């Protein structure tokens, strides 16, 4: 039995929740998010809270209910507060710039790298070596950050590359003669 699913998700004032079968839509000041839940999960909205439980006849109902609770909690946080992900560029000549919804990266290649941001995600560069991604959808923010990092992952000898702000890069010792 899932302990996560037993805790209800509190719906704050200003957040609108619509349940249409297994499709849940949550609307708030930062936008609107929609998700289709597994058939094994039953969601109830009462007293400004969402409660979760398994449907009858499903073996993995509690496990799926815990997953659904975590996903919907992230959606509620996203439409109220939003999510932020910070990236750092480490290396000589590595720099970033944002023009509209395109992130322009200079990462030591013979050409600049332009990355198109999906709808609902904004980026800003406080400095030339920092990128701050903001948005309501936690999964999309994480995917965009992973895509930007994949252009030049931190290498293990000098630590050069694109890294998350809280990432610790373990460096190896150079080969000795």
Swiss-Prot record:
Molecular-function GO terms, alphabetical: rRNA binding; structural constituent of ribosome
Keyword DNA damage in annotation: no
GO biological process, alphabetically ordered: cytoplasmic translation
CC terms in the record's Gene Ontology section: cytosolic large ribosomal subunit
Keywords recorded for this protein, A-Z: Ribonucleoprotein, Ribosomal protein, RNA-binding, rRNA-binding
Keyword Flavoprotein: no
Entries under SUPFAM superfamilies matching the protein: Ribosomal protein L6 (SSF56053)
Family: Belongs to the universal ribosomal protein uL6 family.
Job description of the protein: This protein binds to the 23S rRNA, and is important in its secondary structure. It is located near the subunit interface in the base of the L7/L12 stalk, and near the tRNA binding site of the peptidyltransferase center.
Subunit details: Part of the 50S ribosomal subunit.
Protein name (record): Large ribosomal subunit protein uL6
Species this chain originates from: Citrobacter koseri (strain ATCC BAA-895 / CDC 4225-83 / SGSC4696)
Taxon lineage: Bacteria, Pseudomonadati, Pseudomonadota, Gammaproteobacteria, Enterobacterales
Gene: rplF
